[in-house]
Regions:
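Cofactor-binding active-site loop characterized by glycine-rich and histidine/acidic residues
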Residues: 1-97, 121, 377-380, 387, ...
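A glycine-rich helix N-cap at a beta->alpha junction
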Residues: 6-16, 95-107, 128-138, 461-479
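Extended, hydrophobic alpha-helical segments in both membrane/secreted and soluble proteins
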Residues: 73, 78, 86-90, 104, ...
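Conserved acidic/glycine
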Residues: 76, 81-85, 103-105, 109-420, ...
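A short, small-residue-rich loop immediately preceding and capping a beta-strand
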Residues: 37-39, 66-84, 102-104, 364, ...
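Internal gly/pro-rich beta-alpha loop/helix module
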Residues: 226, 259-263, 267-270, 275-279, ...
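Glycine-rich phosphate/pyrophosphate-binding loops
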Residues: 57-67, 431-452, 511-513
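Flexible glycine/proline-rich, aromatic-decorated loop/lid segments
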Residues: 260, 393-403, 459-473, 484-498
Length: 516
């Protein structure tokens, strides 16, 4: 809105579906195709997508398909969101692959919807340990610069000790109850600390800020993160939920439910942040935007221009691919004669044909979650190589065989291990590379059909929202293929799940020629 990208009419339509004229409260590329790049709902989908977007960017550059450059993937998430398995489940990949092009910013306001994230503990320390253990560079932005004078003044070390020992539930209390409460309960534990703030008013104590609300500290963290090499970075920023709302909801458990501020709360918010709106205008709750020639707007526009334009911004311009002629699949269109073959085997043959095609072969990416041998794809290991940023530091035991396990810095296959969510996220990153990198790819994710939509349905819905372009192959499908392995291997319903996604076309091929 301040940049001029959103009109007042659009702002009026926030959280309203108005035939393309509304603003969705969550990121949805389908609803705002020129604006949002990534759908980050449900919770946890943003972090895992960010990891694999960064991973795929490195993959594409390793293969020489895009320039490596200095692009960064930024993911903004909450401390409560980190309890979602998808939020932290893939961070070891980022550390292992040394994805220095990835930055997480975790808004640690210490609260979930219902209550504290770790009322009896300290979520920032917990997350620090998890990320450090996974090989990440961790930057903590805990206390704002208004604390600096007190820290310098404290010669006993008690202030730092008190900061470290207090639990998150109490930190929430300090902001909710006002300056007198932290004077008594935070500083009051040690007489030396009470003396430290004896010359401060309760209001001054109340405005001892947290690091995530201090632009100087945040800038320093961002500068360090963008310059760091050899590791992904996570910034843990200490904030207050409902910051600025005062008694209307600051640090309150019901902040999320506050839909409208009364006149006194509006006046308090205006005064706190110095917004130039007169008393007689407050009840109308007008939008405030500085004039076009104001220093603020001119500065903002200069900075955005120097940084390459506004964010977010989604682009969908790319060069169209040339579809291979039908004769390319001549062998798959012929009868197999007396020999019966599975559609899974037929797919592998189709894939081999496509990879050899001169026009689109380099765009084909097979993705497997530790099932290549199950599907008879191991012949591609040596032919294409399995991508890894480290290459192959060991001699595989089967290196003298034709189909040995070959890892390569320029490998084509993405072998994601026993990790359907990761494999689907890699597929999603490649299936949207036409938009994110102006590099259209054709990813084929092949999986046990029962562990496809049933396992990663949320990511499949996100793929539809993202307008992803690629192929999902549910192999060994059917209720009779793997009866002996039990109910979890008897899939006769994947198409029902696939059909819930409007822009996902599903096929149930019975013969090789249909598949081709």
């Amino acid at each position: 809105f301040l940049e001029g990208r959103f009109s007042e009419e659009q702002m009026d339509n926030f959280r309203r579906e108005v035939d393309g004229g509304g603003l969705s409260s969550y990121p949805h590329p389908w609803l705002m195709p020129d604006y949002w790049q990534f759908p980050t709902v449900s919770m946890g989908l943003g972090p895992i997508q960010a990891i694999y977007q960064a991973h795929v960017m490195r993959y594409l550059s390793a293969r020489g398909l895009v320039a490596r450059g200095d692009r960064k993937v930024w993911a903004f998430l909450g401390d409560g969101e980190c309890d979602e398995p998808e939020s932290l489940g893939a961070i070891s990949l980022a550390g292992r692959e040394q994805l220095e092009n990835l930055i997480f910013v975790v808004n640690c306001n210490l609260q979930r919807l219902d209550g504290p994230v770790r009322g009896n503990g300290k979520i920032m320390q917990e997350l620090e340990g998890v990320f450090r253990g996974a090989g990440w560079n961790v930057i903590k932005v805990v206390w704002g610069r208004h604390w600096d004078r007190l820290i310098e003044k404290d010669t006993t070390g008690l202030l730092i000790k008190r900061m470290d020992e207090v639990c998150d539930g109490e930190l929430q209390n300090y902001k909710f109850n006002g300056g007198a409460y932290p004077r008594e309960h935070f500083f009051g534990k040690y007489p030396e600390l009470l003396e430290l703030v004896a010359d401060m008013t309760d209001e001054q104590i109340m405005y001892l800020n947290r690091g995530g609300h201090d632009p100087y500290k945040v800038y320093a963290a961002y500068a360090e993160a963008t310059a760091h090499k050899g590791q992904p970075t996570v910034i843990l920023a200490h904030t207050v939920k409902g910051y600025g709302l005062g008694g209307a909801g600051e640090a309150a458990n019901d902040t999320h439910s506050v839909k409208k501020l009364d006149i006194d709360s509006l006046r308090g918010f205006r005064d706190r942040f110095g917004i130039p709106i007169a008393d007689d205008q407050l009840e109308k709750v007008p939008y405030y935007r500085p004039a076009e020639d104001s220093p603020e707007i001119e500065y903002m526009r200069r900075r955005r221009a120097s940084l390459g334009g506004s964010l977010p911004a989604r682009k969908a311009d790319f060069n169209a691919m040339q579809t291979p002629p039908l004769k390319t699949f001549a062998k798959q269109l012929e009868s197999s004669g007396e020999r019966e073959i599975s559609t899974t085997m037929a797919f592998v043959r189709v894939l081999s044909t496509l990879i050899k095609d001169k026009s689109i072969g380099s765009s084909i990416v097979p993705i497997v979650p530790d099932e290549a041998r199950t599907f008879g794809m191991e012949g591609m290991f040596r032919q294409l190589g399995i991508y890894t940023s480290e290459g192959q530091k060991y001699v595989p035991h089967d290196h003298q065989q034709i189909m040995y396990y070959k890892e390569d810095k320029k490998g084509v296959i993405l072998e994601e291990g026993i990790n359907e969510a990761g494999a689907m996220s890699a597929w999603l990153a490649l299936a949207t590379a036409y938009s994110t990198s102006s590099c259209p790819m054709i990813p084929f994710y092949i999986f046990y059909s029962m562990f496809g939509f049933q396992r990663i349905g949320d990511l499949a819905w996100a793929a539809g929202d993202s307008q992803a372009r690629g192929f999902l192959i549910g192999a060994t499908a059917g209720r009779t293929t793997l009866n002996g392995e039990g109910l979890q291997h008897q899939d006769g319903h994947s198409h029902i799940l696939a059909n819930t996604i409007p822009n996902c076309r599903s096929y149930d091929a019975a013969y090789s020629y249909e598949l081709a």
